[in-house]
Amino acid sequence: MKKFFKTLLVALLLIPSCAWANGWNNAEYQRIEQSIQLPGIKQSAKKYAISAYGAKQNVSAAQNQKAINKLIALVSKKGGGTVVIPKDTWRTGAIEMKSFVDLHLEEGAVLQFAFEPKLYPLVRTSWEGIACWNYSPCIYAYKVTDIAITGKGTIDGGGNNDTWWPMNGNTRFG
């Protein structure tokens, strides 16, 4: 019984120190929050719907990927604007963001990334802090500024048991 109370006392003394060590002080929180800036995308910038620039419901993910990436590059080259993903499901491959572009998903829009490795080119990225070349993530940005992903739509990366599980390749997970 004596041992139990000693252990309990030690635990009670350690709990506040653990909470203090992991806690954020308010000044640090405010410093970080104040360093965050909104992207420099003009609020009055023109909007470009992907459906008006070649993306369609009844085409391959590769065709939509090409149309979306071409539109993003065009909008960036024009000085910026909003690329709109309209309400519906749009299958695509990797999307590469460019400077001064807001990728906006309307309510009810689904940007669905296809499970086709050829649609994800090798790009410079990092894995657990190590720089490397790897398959592109669904949405990729490198050496760009002032980008945003906004709206009430859904980004579906396709992470389900049929696509992700076989790539994991580790039997200990199931």
Task: Describe the residue ranges of each PLM region.
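Extracellular "leader-to-stem" segments immediately downstream of a signal peptide or signal-anchor
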Residues: 2-84, 89-102, 106-174
